[in-house]
From Swiss-Prot:
It is found in: Cell inner membrane. Belongs to the KdpA family. Pfam families: KdpA (PF03814). It is a multi-pass membrane protein. The keyword Plastid does not apply. The system is composed of three essential subunits: KdpA, KdpB and KdpC. The keyword Transmembrane applies. HAMAP family: KdpA. PANTHER family: POTASSIUM-TRANSPORTING ATPASE A CHAIN (PTHR30607), POTASSIUM-TRANSPORTING ATPASE POTASSIUM-BINDING SUBUNIT (PTHR30607:SF2). GO terms for cellular component: plasma membrane. This is Potassium-transporting ATPase potassium-binding subunit. InterPro entries: KdpA.
């Protein structure tokens, strides 16, 4: 472990806490209708939106109405983005003349951005027009982030309220979190990125002359422009060279800001945050990883304020930080090791495993970024996870298997962790013979059924999807690396989709009707198959009477509960995947020293 890695992580946690604490208080004030929302200019904008949309902000919803409204809202978003891709060829802001996207890819992308997954089976700069990127994908980045935040706010209200059958107004919650939190921060963030070197324009792509002539092997073509092949079917190649390069342009900074802040992760370019137009400098790289955890950390403080016990928020946050530190140090350690396969070929391994990494970021910043982006449901990358060492790739895969509850996505991480907190209290109650209670609310059979559904949905989707893929011809056809790593690529894809992360072991050819359809199904049910039971929990807790603290109440604000909560997350959340992990990265690591 290098000094640079340790100092970076320490600085990161320190700055994160300094920024998250006031933001958490601000979110509490915004969602309760205080602070900035009471100022006349902002109140006018908010009320104008309600009037145009026909919303009565005074009417609250039951959990079922809240859930139906949220699902319907996201279905409309899916249909809009799907249609935008199908007709982008005839729409404006398309200087490259990019054609319409195929129906299966459009379906996958529309689901992906609506569920905050941002899985991308396409090449952004070669597929999506500026209009599609801005009006479709960037808009969904805001709305999907807001959708996650309002769900956790509703759950917190459930804990805070006493014998009330409503959990808030969905449309008011969506409006306020977008108008007062996501948009203002994103505007400032985008300006910062432009200052660092990110681009923001509507220019056509630029052809430039390179400093050096690039030499490479190019396929030989026949008169019809088709590649020539030898008698064995291999493509014939010949030497070629060029001094020309095409530089893609576009409104990058505005999409990049909400991509990171909203833990969306979908890049404007195929290389994502490894591309210098998205992530130009070490400072922009630090701010990007900081922004991934900013709102998830702030919501822990919001939680403590809303339930009138700040200690509860600190317990959840400390649990998240401890798990984050453990897996991040592990990621840096594994990637700092030389690849024995390359070492046997005489390659100097002193720098560690630099394959798939930007030299400007190196081992430390690439590994830290990988750990953060997979703990959160972000999925943005500044290096290629598929090129990590077997155990280095194990870490981001395992991070997602925890259920995206260690900080996790905006909103989704905290409500996922609170689900595990309920389970931890229930398990502790069984062990010591106490009636399980959490935050003054009794936990009964209905609540535990909802907890079980919320926890089991994602592993079922990930493992069943992986099993179907490895047993089907279409699934196996996408594997470029047969063996343990090929299995890991499929497992990673379905784990990423089901947990709404969106990162990939990109060696898998996933832009096919099979994977576009299967992964879209995993993304949709991985999102709303958890949201619905969480909202059901919110409604159930809101309707319950608060129970006064007594001698039989288990304390949930001390070090013991931190250990219990972390143990529950690790044992229950990740053990479902142990057999699959044994077939993938673990066996690949064991085989590594004997590969020649």
């Amino acid at each position: 472990m290098s000094t640079h890695a340790i100092l970076t992580i320490v600085l990161y946690v320190g700055v994160l806490l300094l920024l998250a604490y006031p933001l958490g208080g601000f979110i509490d004030a915004v969602m309760s209708g205080q602070s900035i929302t009471s100022k006349k200019p902002f109140r006018f904008i908010e009320n104008f939106i309600y009037k145009v949309c026909g919303i009565d902000p005074a009417i609250e919803m039951s959990w079922l109405s809240y859930a139906i409204g949220l699902i319907a809202f996201n279905i409309l978003g899916v249909l809009f983005v799907f249609g935008l891709q199908l007709f982008q060829g005839i729409l404006p802001l398309n200087p490259q003349g990019l054609v319409s996207v195929s129906p299966d890819s459009s379906f996958n992308t529309a689901i992906s951005f609506a569920t905050n997954t941002n899985w991308q089976a396409y090449v952004g700069e070669g597929t999506m027009s500026y209009l599609t990127q801005m009006l479709g994908l960037t808009t969904q980045n805001f709305l999907s982030a807001a959708s996650g935040i309002v769900v956790v706010i509703a759950l917190i209200r459930g804990f805070a309220r006493n014998s009330i059958k409503t959990i808030g107004n969905l449309w008011v919650d969506l409006t306020r979190i977008t108008l007062y939190v996501l948009v203002p921060i994103s505007v400032v963030y985008a300006i910062f990125l432009v200052g660092q070197g990110s681009i923001q324009n509507f220019d056509a792509y630029k052809d430039v002359k390179t400093v050096e002539v690039a030499k490479f092997d190019a396929p030989k073509l026949d008169a019809d422009g088709q590649p020539l092949k030898d008698e064995k079917g291999a493509v014939l190649t010949g030497p070629a060279s060029t001094d020309q390069q095409t530089l893609p342009m576009g409104p990058v900074a505005s999409q990049e800001a909400i991509k990171m802040l909203g833990t969306n992760g979908g890049g404007f370019f195929n290389a994502n945050s490894a591309h210098p137009y998205e992530n130009p400098t070490p400072l922009s790289n630090f701010i990007q990883i900081l922004s991934i955890f900013l709102i998830p950390a702030a919501l822990c403080f919001t939680f403590g304020r809303m339930v009138r016990d700040k200690r509860q928020g600190w317990v959840v946050l400390v649990t998240m930080i401890l798990i984050f530190l453990t897996v991040t140090f592990a990621a840096v350690h594994f990637e700092s090791q030389a690849n024995p396969v390359l070492t046997n070929l005489g390659v100097d391994g002193a720098m560690g495993n630099m394959e798939g990494k930007e030299t400007r970021f190196g081992i430390d910043d690439s590994s830290i970024f990988a750990s953060i982006t997979t703990l959160a449901s972000c999925g943005a990358v500044n290096s290629m996870h598929d090129s990590f060492m077997p155990m280095g790739g194990f870490v981001p895969l395992w991070n997602m298997m925890l259920g995206e509850v260690v900080f996790g996505g905006v909103g989704t991480g905290l409500y996922g962790m609170l689900v595990f907190a309920i389970l931890a209290v229930f398990i502790a109650g069984l062990m010591i013979g106490r009636t399980p209670e959490y935050l003054g609310k009794k936990i009964e059979s209905y609540e535990m059924k909802m907890v079980a559904i919320a926890i089991l949905v994602t592993p079922i989707l990930a493992l069943v999807g992986t099993a179907i893929a490895v047993m089907s011809v279409d699934g196996v056809a996408g594997i470029a690396n047969p063996g343990a790593h090929g299995f890991s690529e499929i497992l990673y894809a379905f784990t990423s989709a089901a947990n709404n992360n969106g990162s990939a072991f990109a060696g898998l050819s996933a832009n096919t009707p099979f994977y576009n359809s299967m992964l879209a199904i995993a993304m949709w049910f991985g999102r709303f198959g958890v949201i619905v039971p969480v909202l059901a929990l919110a409604g159930a807790f809101a309707a319950k009477k608060k129970i006064a603290v007594n001698e039989g109440t288990m304390p949930t604000h001390g070090p013991l509960f931190i250990v219990l909560l972390a143990g529950t997350v690790i044992l229950v959340g990740a053990l479902n995947y142990v057999p699959a992990l044994a077939l993938g990265p673990i066996v690949e690591q064991l085989m590594l020293p004997v590969i020649h």
